[in-house]
């Protein structure tokens, strides 16, 4: 009741900005996955598009895996160029091709930990090294796998609705 009376921490004037439920779910997901923070959105594409549009602007470049979810591919191929952002699609398992695709205006290296639908496994540790070397942001759609493997079985029922 404190939230509805305006006594809770945070601004919850409109639920589209935030809500106590989203705040607490994000905190629980972050704790569960061993990460600093987690944001909750209504859809995976909502998460992906907002992250990429936050990190990139007109004239920037993204290096992306060529085997990604179709909605993400369509967003990168057809929509984001309207903002002056270009994408190179590469075989993310070939680290030399990844390196060769990086340009001076590249800002993001994008992949899925396990690609949809081909189930190719990205070498996240090596991609992180490349991203650090070139001062890029590594963005990973982790739908099929947890951030940390802390147990043999991890079930996340909100999988399609969370971006951590």
Where on the chain are the PLM-derived regions?
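Conserved PLP-enzyme active-site core in the AAT-like
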Residues: 38-164
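Conserved N-terminal alpha-helix of the aminotransferase class I/II PLP-enzyme fold
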Residues: 1-46, 71-78
């Amino acid at each position: 009741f404190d939230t509805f009376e305006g006594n809770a921490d945070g601004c919850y004037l409109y639920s589209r900005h935030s809500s106590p439920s989203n705040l607490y779910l994000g905190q629980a997901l972050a704790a569960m996955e061993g990460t600093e923070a987690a944001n909750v959105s209504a859809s995976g594409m909502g998460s992906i598009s907002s992250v990429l549009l936050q990190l990139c602007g007109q004239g920037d470049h993204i290096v992306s895996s060529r085997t990604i979810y179709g909605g993400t591919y369509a967003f990168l191929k057809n929509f984001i160029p309207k903002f002056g952002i270009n994408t190179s699609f590469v075989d993310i398992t070939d680290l030399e091709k990844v390196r060769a695709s990086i340009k001076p205006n590249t800002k993001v290296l994008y992949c899925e930990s396990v690609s949809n639908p081909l189930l190719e496994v990205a070498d996240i540790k090596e991609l992180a090294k490349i991203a650090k070397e070139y001062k890029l942001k590594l963005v990973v759609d982790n739908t099929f796998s947890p951030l940390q493997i802390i147990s043999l079985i991890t079930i996340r029922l909100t999988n399609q609705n969370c971006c951590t």
